[in-house]
């Protein structure tokens, strides 16, 4: 039996080659892999010797040869194929182990297009596809994680059809992801990310028990190992809905750098948020906004969950806690709670991936766009439209209100006071209804809105929301502006003695 090993990621390849040698396999190899194997005492044969054809064009042509692809592709149970192989001196290659040139890593490391082009693998994908096509006769290995299992099955002679087929699927996933990555990069570089095709490729992290509802299948996929590197379960398993809520929580809790922010999320929308001096103070303040909706919600903690904070959270039922880090003592607080799920990123503060693009499935396709980021410049460059100036504390609250509004489903209005969200109206079909809903909820919970800052993620089309805000004592309003009736809104703010600021940037979220 003969194996061809040619890898860019050389982790575990020496041990894998030695394991094959112990099973009396002959080893073929190329370039850097060959040199490493020889240095480690593996009796490898260089592919150029096997093909009697040298590497050419600075290594661009190594394995693109009939003796390589014929050795991989000919069917062992087809008499015509076997005869042709014998006629042309083609010997079988029964295992192909390949991982591809590090294209992604190269694009991160350099902007030199010539170097990037040289890190587009040609021979590797060709071998992978050849071996995958002939998977009944050839084992195709594209993942370091499969080395031990393959050696085990070869020893036990249990490399059956189903196992080979599973490796074939992985191989085509591997080459498809690789080519998609290259195409996306070229479109990002030369077409602003909006070429004639866009590929969305993720790697499975885990299956969820079900999807959004019990009759739907579901799973979590990741880009660039984000969850592999930044998500660890300490208690319980994340559901599909948990992950969408965690996403909303992370977007909000990471919007204030290393500030001790706490976000409480329900159905991907905030029902509590605060930035106080400590995480405990932030949680207590966030919970006051809507303690009823917080029941069964997701709590995101931009810092370490300690025992004191854990005891406070444990006073109500929350389904999920996601924290930058979790103390052992804090984890013990929840030992008796069977339903709570606790996850950590094992970081000092929470992090998010900051993907550059965003997409939404629509029936028959998807819409694709640049990611909407709330930039600090929006607040730094906002224009005062009213006669009255905001105070320093009001401007701090305006920053919080603006970011919360921008990350909440439209139509949305947010009321913030002393660093905490105290009322919110969201996902409404009219902006004035969102304003009314927020005020009504605050009254129901006996929350005093006087002195609040009001934010809206899009312009107020009429002055009615400003009039409503004035009745509950709002002192400052921040919105994008851009309505044909902006003058009426400005006039209303001046009438009520409010400060009014326009950011000039809309943040619809659907």
Curated annotation (Swiss-Prot):
The keyword Transferase applies. Gene3D superfamilies: 3.40.140.20, Methylglyoxal synthase-like domain (3.40.50.1380). The keyword Transferase applies. One of its GO terms (cellular component) is cytosol. Signal peptide: none annotated. Its EC number is 2.1.2.3, 3.5.4.10. Residues 1-142 form the MGS-like domain. CDD domains: IMPCH. InterPro entries: AICAR_Tfase_dup_dom_sf (IPR024051), Cytidine_deaminase-like (IPR016193), MGS-like_dom (IPR011607), MGS-like_dom_sf (IPR036914), PurH-like (IPR002695). Pathway: Purine metabolism; IMP biosynthesis via de novo pathway; 5-formamido-1-(5-phospho-D-ribosyl)imidazole-4-carboxamide from 5-amino-1-(5-phospho-D-ribosyl)imidazole-4-carboxamide (10-formyl THF route): step 1/1; Purine metabolism; IMP biosynthesis via de novo pathway; IMP from 5-formamido-1-(5-phospho-D-ribosyl)imidazole-4-carboxamide: step 1/1. Belongs to the PurH family. The IMP cyclohydrolase activity resides in the N-terminal region. PANTHER family: BIFUNCTIONAL PURINE BIOSYNTHESIS PROTEIN ATIC, BIFUNCTIONAL PURINE BIOSYNTHESIS PROTEIN PURH. This is Bifunctional purine biosynthesis protein PurH. It comes from Campylobacter concisus (strain 13826). The gene is purH.
């Amino acid at each position: 039996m003969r194996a061809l090993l040619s890898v860019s990621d050389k982790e575990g390849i020496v041990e894998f080659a030695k394991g094959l040698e112990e099973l009396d396999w002959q080893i073929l190899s190329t370039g850097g892999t060959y040199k490493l194997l020889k240095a480690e005492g593996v009796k490898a044969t260089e592919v150029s010797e096997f093909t009697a054809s040298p590497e050419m064009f600075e290594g661009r042509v190594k394995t693109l040869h009939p003796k390589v692809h014929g050795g991989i592709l000919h069917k062992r149970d087809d008499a015509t194929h076997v005869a042709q192989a014998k006629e042309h001196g083609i010997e079988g290659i029964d295992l192909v182990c390949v991982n591809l040139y590090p294209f992604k890593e190269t694009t991160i490391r350099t902007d030199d297009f010539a170097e990037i082009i040289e890190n587009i693998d040609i021979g590797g994908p060709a071998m992978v596809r050849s071996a995958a096509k002939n998977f009944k006769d050839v084992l195709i290995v594209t993942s370091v994680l499969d080395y031990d299992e393959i050696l085990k099955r070869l020893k036990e002679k249990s490399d059956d059809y189903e196992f080979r087929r599973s490796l074939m699927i992985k191989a085509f996933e591997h080459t498809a992801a690789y080519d998609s990555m290259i195409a996306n990069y070229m479109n990002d570089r030369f077409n602003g990310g909006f070429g004639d095709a866009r590929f969305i490729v993720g790697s499975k992290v885990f299956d969820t028990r079900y999807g959004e509802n019990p009759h739907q299948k579901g799973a979590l996929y990741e880009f660039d190992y984000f969850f592999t590197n930044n998500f660890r379960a300490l208690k319980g398993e994340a559901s599909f809905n948990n992950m969408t809520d965690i996403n909303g929580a992370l977007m909000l809790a990471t919007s204030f750098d290393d500030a001790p922010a706490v976000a409480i999320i329900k159905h991907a929308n905030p029902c509590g948020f605060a930035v106080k001096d400590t995480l405990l103070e932030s949680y207590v303040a966030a919970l006051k906004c809507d303690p009823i909706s917080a029941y069964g919600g997701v709590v995101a903690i931009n810092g370490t969950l300690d025992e004191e904070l854990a005891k406070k959270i444990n006073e109500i039922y929350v389904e999920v806690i996601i924290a930058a880090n979790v103390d052992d003592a804090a984890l013990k607080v929840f030992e008796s709670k069977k339903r709570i799920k606790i996850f950590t990123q094992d970081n000092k503060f929470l992090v998010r991936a900051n993907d550059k693009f965003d997409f939404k499935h629509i029936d028959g396709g998807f819409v694709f766009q640049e990611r909407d980021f709330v930039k600090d410049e929006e607040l730094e460059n906002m224009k005062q439209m009213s006669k009255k100036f905001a105070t320093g504390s009001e401007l701090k609250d305006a920053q919080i209100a603006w970011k919360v509004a921008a990350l909440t489903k439209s139509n949305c209005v947010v009321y913030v006071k002393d660093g905490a969200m105290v009322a919110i109206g969201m996902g409404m079909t009219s902006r004035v209804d969102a304003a009314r809903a927020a005020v009504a909820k605050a009254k129901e919970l006996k929350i005093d809105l006087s002195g609040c800052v009001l934010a809206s993620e899009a312009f107020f089309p009429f002055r009615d929301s400003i009039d409503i805000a004035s009745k509950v004592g709002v002192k400052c309003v921040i919105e994008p502006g851009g309505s044909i009736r902006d003058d009426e809104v400005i006039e209303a703010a001046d009438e009520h003695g409010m400060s009014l600021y326009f950011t000039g940037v809309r943040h619809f979220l659907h």
